């Protein structure tokens, strides 16, 4: 029997989940190579795009009804193959909505093909793909510095998807992330577009049901600060690669470090949100219904090499004219801007505001005009537990 003899084999009936997951990787190069790593927790698919962006797709073993690695094998299994080969096969097999198709993934080690076996009530098909090995992937500059974060937030995936779609429709060329918190009012997360129409902004809803958590740090991942906007500049063509992933997301975790690296963690169709580096906790989430298998996507994007002072001033002035900004009572302190290169980091604080003189942050009361049930209570900060709650 194939399942008992191959080095690795796994069987699932969730072809629609596989197809959606693989589709999220296509903006990063549909016909390019993808590095596959297999261990006892699941499969990881990694694809880099010009060393300025990277996507990691993790399929947990809970996605499969049968999952096996040969007894006695230690370590990880690695191979490379073309992403479009997998996507084409899964797409064709998933067209028949009236019959259950069972898909088996199988690999017997270096020098053997990666196989997909598709079986329904009428026929069994076997597809073999050529595989090869490459050297270690260079991840220099694409690893998040979790000890030196500028901000992190958790928000609903469909809201971010709608915002990215709207920015695309108005011809956005460059996108600024504008993040600010206050001890007296709700936080603000905005996307500012620069394109042929000039500057325009999309302010995401600040209700707790949408923006679950938003914290700004003093470049150390622990010290909370308020009334000091963080502005980051990204090429929209790169940022828009997130859109297929956010379309299937339940919640999205966004973090940015002082080196200008933006990390976006996405999990599809489940409330058991996990950060990929916490994979050991997946074992504790096996109570998740089989109808919602665990699919985790992590995307890394590098900020543009420099942010002009004039551009940042324009963005800051645009946000100061926002009615939401005026109602919230944010202090007009200087923005925090980080100019980065792939190998060097420099942080510059502009404006008259002093970050070091701020009082320790405290939870702020609900606004008088808000229903008590909608009051905002920032989630506790604890880097030792999964950030998704």
UniProtKB/Swiss-Prot annotation:
Compositional bias annotation for Polar residues: 380-389
Main location group: nucleus
Location in the cell: Nucleus
Keywords tagged on the record: DNA damage, DNA repair, DNA-binding, Hydrolase, Nuclease, Nucleus
GO cellular component: checkpoint clamp complex
A molecular function (GO) term: nuclease activity
Keyword DNA repair: yes
Region (Disordered): 358-389
One Gene Ontology term from the biological process aspect of the record: DNA repair
Oligomer and partners: Component of the checkpoint clamp complex composed of DDC1, MEC3 and RAD17.
PANTHER family: CELL CYCLE CHECKPOINT PROTEIN RAD1
Biological role stated in the UniProt entry: Component of the checkpoint clamp complex involved in the surveillance mechanism that allows the DNA repair pathways to act to restore the integrity of the DNA prior to DNA synthesis or separation of the replicated chromosomes.
Family: Belongs to the rad1 family.
This protein's name: DNA damage checkpoint control protein RAD17
Originating species: Eremothecium gossypii (strain ATCC 10895 / CBS 109.51 / FGSC 9923 / NRRL Y-1056)
Lineage per the UniProt record: Eukaryota, Fungi, Dikarya, Ascomycota, Saccharomycotina
This protein's encoding gene: RAD17
